[in-house]
């Protein structure tokens, strides 16, 4: 089980990312556009740098939905490998069965 503070911090980051997502996309579009003047590009870069660090989506960590485990995360299930294995053995994941060949 991950620390509750780490799980809460990650949730807070998700909210910040969502809040700034639209403006970040606009600024990045200005920066990447080859027709943008150098002054506008530099101004957009400065504004992007002034945003909070947690506004960047790369700072959000994928965590197990059940207990917040940060490693061994499987996107398909939204759970860690440990939790997927436990639930699969108990038959709680529809369509998942033990492999045999």
Curated annotation (Swiss-Prot):
Keyword annotations: Ribonucleoprotein, Ribosomal protein, RNA-binding, rRNA-binding
A Pfam family hit: Ribosomal_S14
A biological process term (GO) from this entry: translation
Entry-linked Gene3D superfamilies: 1.10.287.1480
Source superkingdom: Bacteria
Record has RNA-binding as a keyword: yes
InterPro entries: Ribosomal_uS14 (IPR001209), Ribosomal_uS14_bac/plastid (IPR023036)
A GO molecular-function annotation: rRNA binding
GO cellular component, one term: small ribosomal subunit
Keyword Chaperone set for record: no
Membership in a protein family: Belongs to the universal ribosomal protein uS14 family.
NCBIfam families recorded: PRK08881.1
PANTHER family cross-referenced by the UniProt entry: 30S RIBOSOMAL PROTEIN S14, SMALL RIBOSOMAL SUBUNIT PROTEIN US14A
Biological function: Binds 16S rRNA, required for the assembly of 30S particles and may also be responsible for determining the conformation of the 16S rRNA at the A site.
Quaternary structure and partners: Part of the 30S ribosomal subunit. Contacts proteins S3 and S10.
Name used for this protein in its record: Small ribosomal subunit protein uS14
Organism: Corynebacterium urealyticum (strain ATCC 43042 / DSM 7109)
């Amino acid at each position: 089980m991950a620390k509750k503070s780490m799980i809460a911090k990650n949730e807070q980051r998700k909210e910040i990312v969502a809040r700034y997502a639209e403006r970040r996309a606009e600024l990045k579009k200005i920066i990447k556009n080859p027709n943008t003047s150098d002054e506008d590009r530099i101004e957009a870069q400065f504004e992007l740098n002034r945003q909070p660090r947690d506004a960047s989506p790369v700072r959000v960590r994928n965590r197990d939905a059940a207990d917040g485990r940060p490693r061994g995360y499987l996107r398909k299930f939204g759970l860690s490998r440990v939790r997927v294995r436990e639930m699969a053995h108990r038959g709680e994941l529809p369509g998942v069965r033990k492999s045999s060949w």
